[in-house]
Every structure is written in C-alpha cells, then in structure tokens.
Amino acid sequence: MMRNVTREATSLGLGLALAAGMAGCRVHVDKDANGEEKTVQVDTPFGGVHVNTDQITAADLGLQVYPGAVAVNDNDKHKSADVHLGFGQWELRVRAVSYETPDSAEKVTAFYKKGLGRYGDVITCQGNSPIGTPATTSEGLTCADNDKNANVKFDREDYGTGKDSLELKAGSKRHQHIVGFEHPKDGKTRFALVALDLPAVMDEGSGKSD
C-alpha cells in the first residue's frame, strides 16, 4: 500500500527543499525502531509535504473495520499511510490502511457496500470496468476515474491493489472512498481502505478551480 506515493512524495518534498536552497525550509524525519521512515515533514515558503505511516485506522477514513479484521503490513512494511501535499491552492491527500480477514471476499464486499453507502452511490469495479449497476455515481465518479484527474496521475498500484483488482468506489472524481482487494495471502482476504482527495482542476482562463 502506498509504496509509490510515499516514496515519491518524500522525494518531491526533499527535492523542493533543495531547489529552494533550504532558505526558509524545514525538514524533519522520524524513523522507527527498524530504521524505516515513519514520518517525513518538508515545509517550504510555498508549500509542504507531510508523510505519516502507521498512524491512521479505518475510523480516520470514515469507515468501520470489518468485524475481526486486523491491520497488516504490506510490501512497504507499513500498515497505513497518510500523505498530504499542499502548494497554494493545489492539494493532494491520500490515506490508506490495509487489513486482512479469514472471511471470504464476498462477505467483505457485502459489508463495505453497505458502509460506503453513507457517501452516496457505490459502484463495483473490476479494473476500469464496472460490474453491474450503477456504473457511475450520482457525482460522476466512474471505474476509470482513478487516473483521469487533470493535475495528477494516480493508479491502483499506488495504494496497494492491482491493475485489474476488484474495487468498491463511492464519492466524486475529486473526493473518493475506495475499498480495494489485494491478492489473497495464506488463505486470507486482504483489502485496502482508501480515501483520496485530489487537486481541483484549474480553469486556465479564469484561474478558478472546479
């Protein structure tokens, strides 16, 4: 989960600090007992990058934990990540946490279809293709909208699921709640809960956002 986003956000923040000659910049990095970066904060006069790992839960994303599910580490050695990039009016935030349960994916899917309902219509996706109806939320979100934001390219592998993974999605193109299913491990169902807040699309003529 978040293996690409966490690494790229950290690199971006450090690069910006170096580009600014460190004038007025503040860089702070905390590591865990294993030497892994746990928090990274880069603040500059024109914006900043904050990366926090293993500090959020499903509740922070506005969702319940599936009964009996436990948070698990992924290939990035973190159970969760909270990445926030803000530069003036341009802001991107990605929050994600991985869980596993011995129950079937069908049971987990049914649970989160109900849970995501608080955010409006829920669509079921296999990769970029919808399964059943609705195929689009009332706010215009589709299965193919993961990488269609004009200001940032984003795909499923950035938060831990695969290219053709099963996903449940709710919300709008800019504000999405996602339950993405990862490859099963040791006979257990693995899934990631994700909240995406993407940058507004700027109107070049007026300078206003959507």
Where are these regions (language model features)?
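An acidic-aromatic pocket/loop used at catalytic or ligand-binding sites
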Residues: 25-210
